Swiss-Prot record:
Keyword vocabulary terms for this entry: Amino-acid biosynthesis, Arginine biosynthesis, Cytoplasm, NADP, Oxidoreductase
Gene: argC
Annotated metabolic or biological route of this protein: Amino-acid biosynthesis; L-arginine biosynthesis; N(2)-acetyl-L-ornithine from L-glutamate: step 3/4
Gene Ontology terms for molecular function: N-acetyl-gamma-glutamyl-phosphate reductase activity; NAD binding; NADP+ binding
Residues of the active site: C136
Cross-referenced PROSITE patterns: ARGC
PANTHER family noted in UniProt: N-ACETYL-GAMMA-GLUTAMYL-PHOSPHATE REDUCTASE, CHLOROPLASTIC-RELATED, N-ACETYL-GAMMA-GLUTAMYL-PHOSPHATE REDUCTASE, CHLOROPLASTIC-RELATED-RELATED
Listed name of the protein: N-acetyl-gamma-glutamyl-phosphate reductase
Species: Xanthomonas axonopodis pv. citri (strain 306)
Catalytic activity, as annotated: N-acetyl-L-glutamate 5-semialdehyde + phosphate + NADP(+) = N-acetyl-L-glutamyl 5-phosphate + NADPH + H(+)
Stated family: Belongs to the NAGSA dehydrogenase family. Type 1 subfamily.
EC number: 1.2.1.38
């Protein structure tokens, strides 16, 4: 019996994440790319901009109602923050059964939406057709903090450094290679959206200081954790190993991971466990590709989970 592929549309397909999504959809045996929406690229062939896609589809400039009329089985919204609501409203009205995955921060605090960080929230998925994809920094922070959450004596301090692709394609200081050359650019040093996101998800205050670096892709997250009681390095390492033993996308490593080794890869590396004298303060480092596990790969995990497929279909 032949399984009919599910149709999928991507809104905001010009961006870096949109490009990665197209690659993953092209590799997926059960998905058919039915539309891609981009105002800037409207009329141009997708294959001219993305080597992974070999079909005849062209970019379209679709408003919210036009997207809803397409009646795709799945719609992924890869739009800047604050832009998703009209599309969600139109789909809610026309085809509420459509699976919507939103990559912006717009619905991460909405309890009606499933918050899709599979390694931590998979067990709470209950068939929701509205899924909010976590932030890139927020993914790295939560995966690093979670194994020690019950041992925390105070707010984790998280020093994050991202490649400039995290600043999107709209020109700004934070994605200007000339300004970033030989530079590190701190920004939003308190109350960053991802700081609030992680605090809400984990139920503890978190302190986060983000920076943009000259490399294109990949995040390094260095997390300082104060512990209620002394733990040995072996005990801490065991917590991470046991917590993620069945998670193919999470690799626990001995040395502190390098961002250059994770760029272009779907997973997360966590390691470099270093204790301060007294064993009540530990520093742990995580790396991930902000465009993949921080965005497109995670969206594909959530899509597969929601449709009852192997979570890593098209990913490995």
């Amino acid at each position: 019996m032949t399984v009919q592929p599910k149709t999928i549309g991507i809104v905001g397909a010009r961006g870096h994440t949109g490009s990665e999504l197209i690659k993953l959809v092209a590799a997926h045996p059960q998905l058919h790319l039915s539309f891609v929406s981009s105002r800037e690229l409207a009329g141009q062939r997708v294959a001219e901009h993305n080597d992974a896609y070999q079909g005849q589809l062209r970019y379209e400039n679709l408003d919210a109602d036009a997207v809803a009329v397409k009646a795709a089985d799945v719609v992924i919204l890869a739009l800047p923050n604050g832009k998703a609501a009209p599309f969600v409203a139109a789909i809610d009205a026309a085809t509420p059964q459509t699976l919507v995955i939103d990559l912006s921060a717009d619905y991460r605090f909405d309890p009606a939406w499933y918050y899709g960080l599979p390694e931590l929230t998979r067990g709470s998925y209950a068939g929701q057709r509205r899924i909010s994809n976590p932030g890139c920094y927020a993914t790295a922070m939560q995966l690093t903090i979670a194994p020690l959450l019950d041992q925390l004596a105070g707010p984790p301090q998280c020093f994050g450094v991202s490649g400039y692709s995290g600043a999107g394609t709209t020109p700004s200081d934070k994605n200007n290679p000339e300004l970033l050359s030989n530079n590190l650019m701190p920004y939003a040093l308190t109350n960053h959206m991802h700081e609030r996101e992680v605090s809400a998800q984990l139920g503890v205050p978190v302190e986060f200081m983000p920076h943009v670096a000259p490399h294109f892709r990949g995040i390094t997250m260095t997390v300082n954790l104060w512990l209620q009681q002394p733990l040995t390095r072996e005990q801490i390492q065991a917590r991470y190993t046991q917590r993620y033993a069945d998670e193919p996308l999470i690799e626990i490593v001995d040395e502190a991971p390098w961002v250059s080794r994770i760029a272009g890869k779907h997973g997360v590396q966590i390691g470099g466990v270093t204790l301060a004298p007294g064993n009540k303060r530990v520093v742990v480092v995580a790396t991930l590709d902000n465009l993949l596990k921080g965005a497109a790969t995670q969206a594909m995990q959530n899509l597969n989970l929601a449709l009852g497929w192997d979570e890593l279909m098209a990913i490995r």
